[in-house]
Amino acid sequence: MLDSFKENEALRKYLFSGHFGLEKENIRVTSDGKLALTPHPAIFGPKEDNPYIKTDFSESQIEMITPVTDSIDAVYEWLENLHNIVSLRAENELLWPSSNPPILPAEEDIPIAEYKTPDSPDRKYREHLAKGYGKKIQLLSGIHYNFSFPEALIDGLYAEISHPNESKRDFKNRLYLKVAKYFMKNRWLLIYLTGASPVYLADFTKTNSEEVLNDGSKALHRGISLRNSNAGYKNKESLFVDYNSFDAYISSISNYIEAGKIESMREFYNPIRLKNAHTDQTVESLAKHGVEYLEIRSIDLNPLEPNGISKDELIFIHLFLIKGLLSEDRELCANNQQLADENENNIALNGLAQPAIKNCDNEEMSLADAGLLELDKMSDFIQSLIPNDNHFQAIIEKQKERLLHPEKTIAAQVQAQSAKEGYVEFHLNQAKTYMEETEALAYKLVGAEDMELSTQIIWKDAIARGIKVDVLDRAENFLRFQKGDHVEYVKQASKTSKDNYVSVLMMENKVVTKLVLAEHGIRVPFGDSFSDQALALEAFSLFEDKQIVVKPKSTNYGWGISIFKNKFTLEDYQEALNIAFSYDSSVIIEEFIPGDEFRFLVINDKVEAVLKRVPANVTGDGIHTVRQLVEEKNTDPLRGTDHLKPLEKIRTGPEETLMLSMQNLSWDSIPKAEEIIYLRENSNVSTGGDSIDYTEEMDDYFKEIAIRATQVLDAKICGVDIIVPRETIDRDKHAIIELNFNPAMHMHCFPYQGEKKKIGDKILDFLFE
């Protein structure tokens, strides 16, 4: 078969691609490493309805399922995002990073997963497993790796090497059977290289190859993977199926079901299973539709990786499957399966001692030699098909290092750290470290960092609920959300089907906004608008002795605004006009209202968040210049540009320069220690300001004003900016200075100070409930 790829460049390009899907199980634990007995987090909804986040056997055993993707990069991004979403939503709990369980309660207190009804087929199946195998063993967790070859690859091979009169369906079945046979024979190598469960608690199980560690936990003596050993999660007896043909494979599984050895194909716990994409996962469905993908079930959670597996491990498993496709198709009889099982168990229990491997002729070869033989073959076919590759070869070289140096295996490192820190402490420390890393980047959706932060937030919140998300226009942050038959289109996180078009037009035009609000008795600053810069300049005498604001008529995010609270010159006024007219063809000059500026986020006639916005500023140290202080403050990892991070970097543009000049300062001025220098007069977070949550502290009087303003304009998702007087006695001197039809949500979700609000959830509630 290798020759087919050497001679056919069009076919060769498909060999190293494919379709990938991952399923990952983690136990939810308390901060002291005990099984969490809390219900599955409600935000994820019923397990039956969420395609991404479910439970495995136990209510405490969360399962993350990626959609099918066309690359390992994409499936890994999905896995990382799901892991982060689940970690952040499992409040006050951690995700246990080991395949082997944490501290468990009594058997009868381990909760089986709950479903909508007590007689749910999923619930009944789990009750059957609990009765037949016990609950504790069900808590062994791992990763399932789902893979299929590209259809174009199968079509090309079918045209070149299919048997006479063989249908494409039969050819496809035969192809996947061949790969499965290779996997079954050589899975010992994968277990040696990826196994990561050599340590376990003393009361979990007992093996014939164990030693007691200092903390009382147990470790397999020179072992690799408890989960993949005979003491792991296996069928009660070995089930050898017939791999000679697809029909024989189906018949042998059917016979085991009829004999009562297993209840259904779901209970066929082979390390690799032939599957199709139909939800009816029965042997009859597989026989009818044929093989569509392979499910690899023997991968341990890697406690050394935040997401339980590395991207290079995923790539290596892919190469392993390609090797199976290119290998000679050999018989896998019951005797050979018995030998393969023995190799698997021997490596799982004693792999670090590097026991000999038996081939199908019952001949022995050292583990290192047998492993290097397979890895060299991988290296050879990669070299012959993609001679300029470096990445794949580097991954294979790393596996060779693990064969030659057992101490470099994942299992050896896990065992060493567990012996040093204790089984529970080591895995708890890993879980806490990963949680801290997740929390530090809680605002981010991996793979969507180029999109607005508010879009990333609502996208993540949609995934948590099992809502399907399609990107319609990446540059425009335009998404489609779908839950069942319900579809919603959302742009920039807050432009939705609930918007009234004329309301948007009114809010976009600040003159119209003020006029309509004033007509309804809502206080707004008085002022004038100008479309001619020369006329605006001539009006200087009307404003020179007043406190004023100069701003574009139709802009957002606080851009182009200048505020004069003190005496200003004609030159200052002219520069403010230049700035404002650079953003719009019309500007507004209005009175300055003293007080503090607050953003009220109103969703469907309810104030969901209130934020105090402090203008962009730096604090002096008596040593550094203003410019240097800005540069230092901008190094905060939470500050970015274009709304890609929770806080915006402070700019050094004309607005900031003007503000400094009004204070008789320049960029080279050195402020005194603890002296606060403001770089902007307006307090918009989008111009580098700091955000402080005030939702609970804000007087309901002003919340009602914000709601009334949105009702006047019939705005359903709206940011209302209100200047609130500092003295309660002056509260009637407030003023609404702006209504925003596309309010940013990220500053409420990740404020500089104060409580984080789940605004994405609030918008999704509004759209879908």
Swiss-Prot record:
Residues 1-347 are annotated as: Glutamate--cysteine ligase. Signal peptide: none annotated. GO terms for cellular component: cytosol. Mg(2+) 2 binds at residues 738, 740. GO terms for molecular function: ATP binding; glutamate-cysteine ligase activity; glutathione synthase activity; metal ion binding. It comes from the Bacteria. ATP binds at residues 541-599. Residues 514-768 form the ATP-grasp domain. Pfam families: ATP-grasp_6, GARS_A, Glu_cys_ligase. NCBIfam families: glu_cys_lig_rel (TIGR01435), PRK02471.1 (NF002688). This is Glutathione biosynthesis bifunctional protein GshAB. It comes from Listeria innocua serovar 6a (strain ATCC BAA-680 / CLIP 11262).
